[in-house]
Amino acid sequence: MGCTISTTNNAPHSPRQEDAPPLPPQTRQSFVGVVNGLLSDLPKRRRRGGLLSDPDISLAGYLLSKAVIGDPVEPQDIPRLHKANNTVQETRARFPYGRGNVATDIAVSDHASSQHAQAAHDVFVDLVRGAAPASMLTNPTLGHAVVSEFVQGGHCAGYAAVATMRHVQKLQPEESVHYVQHNHQGHDWAESRVPDGHHKTIVLDPWAQGPAVLASDSRFAANAQHTQERLALNAKDGDDIAAKTAAGAQYLLENCLPLTETHLKRLKAQEFHCAPEEVWQPQPVVSDAFRRRVRQGLATLTNSSELGLSQSEQSSKALKKMSIKSACALGFGKKAASAAAEDIAAAAYQLGEQSQ
């Protein structure tokens, strides 16, 4: 079940770092200055952002990052990214207490995220030992997704299961969704694929920090040889999965509410905490190599000047134009895109700066 609750095969505190040496001090100072300027009044500007939601801004920031490094997302892939990003956001919304094994969520929730994750695990075990619907047992990923949503708790495996089951209902005929595990890092996520190859694969990792991204840019999925597929579904499975998910949720509501409450009360009374060796620091969805390329690309914009404009004026002008283009690529009008332009630029800087 991925990052499971166990005393064996514990997930590492943080995964292996990629080689990403820091930027030169002068370049980094310039970079950080622009970041601080963009972020200083971000909450106030975001309230005026109009029609772009936070997930839209995050995805537009990724599109901007790709453009900045000279590797823009192909137009035909953007609708799939947008759809996948919506699934990522929908999945995160199903876990109001946060991730059960991520330090920041544990702290904010005062360990409630860990208690709900453990309760979800315990309820699932009880179902396996009891008389759960056959569909929840013959398809463990579906069962895991239904239980995780019901208990509102999980680790990466629960998040990946929910994303997989939600996304299958959105697939076009040529698309498929896959539940994937890393062979070495103890991490699970979902992928949206088309027949064109790995370079078109989109990673849906709601447990990680960031939007849906192309697999080539991701922290865990970039090398397909290091991963294994545990479940594959296509568009024809959508209606069946939707029906079985609804039936499973109804079964839990009618039969498992007292059981769930009992587990949660017990765990709270015991002051259950996730074992320290199983706690992860927040993981960026993108790789260290991608983050470095973004930092370098943005720093190049920051340090360039043309037409007599100052560095800051030129940087602001270029970033705003590219930010507007990124939002328009997601289907937003120019007015909404312009209103959110600085937020999108800030999202790109944050994507480049994400650290563990």
What label would you give each PLM region?
Residues 12-15, 24-356:
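A structural boundary/capping signal
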Residues 1-18:
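Short, compositionally biased, intrinsically disordered N-terminal export/targeting signals
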